[in-house]
Amino acid sequence: MRFITCRLPDGVEDPAILSADGRQVWPLSWLGLSYETLSDAIPFLTPQVRAGLSLAIAGIPALPIEAVTLESPIPAPAQDVICLGINYMAHSDEAEKYSADAFATQHQDAIYFSKRVTRAVPDGGFIEAHTDLVKKLDYECELAVVLGRDAKDVPAGQTRDYVFGYTILNDVSARDVQTAHKQWYFGKSLDGFTPIGPCIVTADEFEAYPPKLPIRCFVNGEKRQDSNTGLQIFNIDHVIAELSQGMTLRAGTIIATGTPAGVGMGMDPPRFLVPGDEVQCEIEGIGILTNTVR
């Protein structure tokens, strides 16, 4: 099942179900579920509830997608996004080539950092260039995991039931800010730096766990990234199990699982984003997240 957040014709922002073909929308409020945000609804959208919703929407007229304004599925995350750095081997190599001082690529343990998201950028929304502050703007196409229930001290091999679903996240990054500060938080947390979407696809739509999905990124139609989430160094099962040891991961937590090779800083010479560039992040089985830099 696919979930979105959208603005209805009357201006109300509502979580909703999206049809598999992306053409029809059923607001949850039409189905008797009164939740202000999808984050609020997620803990209650169990497999049993979703099965009932599937039956219910079969008899209810839908809104056409053109009648609503698509927002990010989780427009304002309750907590910072948890991110993994250097989680594909080929990206590790290009990051070290760009700046071994700023990117610690030799590691035996996962690298975690957080990303502040005041308001997530929806599919079709704008990446803010911040040209007064940023001269080296970069993209990072990533698979993001959304937790469906609180996780604490979950053993590896038992994390699957804690995953609500998956979405696409573009971890937009200011490389010059990163290298200047020798850390990643500030350079990844500027307003307009976190496109998320276009929807959340529930975990039961994918047979494998962790899923092994083709992941690609295009800039102005040119393929820049082309990999598979199965090539992650630390997979989703490992990450949830490790992070939940001594730390409670709340339902609705978003974990961005790292980007593959092909980012702008890894090119020779580096090629960074400028206003007017269009970035498309694509993960098979989820969709395409398209944003323009301004």
Regions found by a protein language model. Give the residues of each.
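Structural signature of FAD isoalloxazine-binding scaffolds in flavoprotein oxidoreductases
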Residues: 100-121, 139, 274-285
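Short acidic-glycine loop/turn motifs at beta-strand connectors
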Residues: 8-10, 18-24, 147-149, 203, ...
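Catalytic-pocket segment enriched in acidic/His residues
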Residues: 13, 49-50, 61-63, 68-69, ...
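Short catalytic-site patches enriched in acidic/histidine residues
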Residues: 98, 111-130, 151-152, 192-201, ...
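Non-heme Fe(II) oxygenase catalytic core, chiefly the N-lobe of the double-stranded beta-helix
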Residues: 121-159, 164, 169-173
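A generic local secondary-structure boundary/capping motif
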Residues: 4, 71-73, 100-103, 128-137, ...
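Short beta-strand segments
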Residues: 7, 83-84, 114, 138-148, ...
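N-terminal non-catalytic cap/leader segment that marks the start of a structured domain
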Residues: 1-106, 110, 280
